[in-house]
Amino acid sequence: GDVVEWSRYESYWRYMLDDNFGYFSKIPTMAVSGNHDTTYKSGDGSSETFKHFNYAMPTQSTAYGFYYSYSYGDVKFIMINTNDLTAASDLKAEQMKWLENELKKTTEKWTIVSLHNPLYSPGKWGSGPNNAIARQLTAQLSDLFAEYGVDLVLQGHDHMISKTKPLGIGSLPVHETKETIDGVEYSVDPKGTIYVMNGPAGNQARTEVYPHDDSLYDYAEGSDACSWA
């Protein structure tokens, strides 16, 4: 999410898409709806996103973003719209009904969910005092993902670098078998959901790590901890 800073201005899309044409002409880009892609800072930015990406989407209200799914090989990807809620409301029933149906009918070996606002993050939107949306998403989605065996959740918004342990029902870490190959430690088919915050793709690194439950995380750092090429 947050494909561009100001989605209502075509100049931002040209800068992002045209300057990176060599990449985008060869590598598919499957975006989720971020707050900068819709009415925040952008007028009705959701319509601008539709003009620049061509996705097959289910029938839905798209005033504040969009949701969809696709399969690639043995992986089912489910792309959620977290602009569909506020600090005072849950994800709407229309999207939740679609989401549970997608999870029920999944036959692929792996299931990956992608969303903009995080459930678990050491940043201000996941662990700070104003993290009401993260707490709502956790209450609404965490057990659902564990129940249906979601393997990985990719999160944005906080610009941090973090990885949780595999989490089961009740947001509790589950036992995992680990194996080291060529000096790299792997979790072997863990029976829980791993939540990853993979940092910003641009230059907005964030440094402040907020108080969080260390028992849930394998790694939790500010994105300034990484060296960007």
What are these regions (language model features)?
Residues 1-2, 6, 28-35, 80-81, ...:
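Active-site neighborhood of phospho(di)ester-bond hydrolases with catalytic His/Asp-centered motifs
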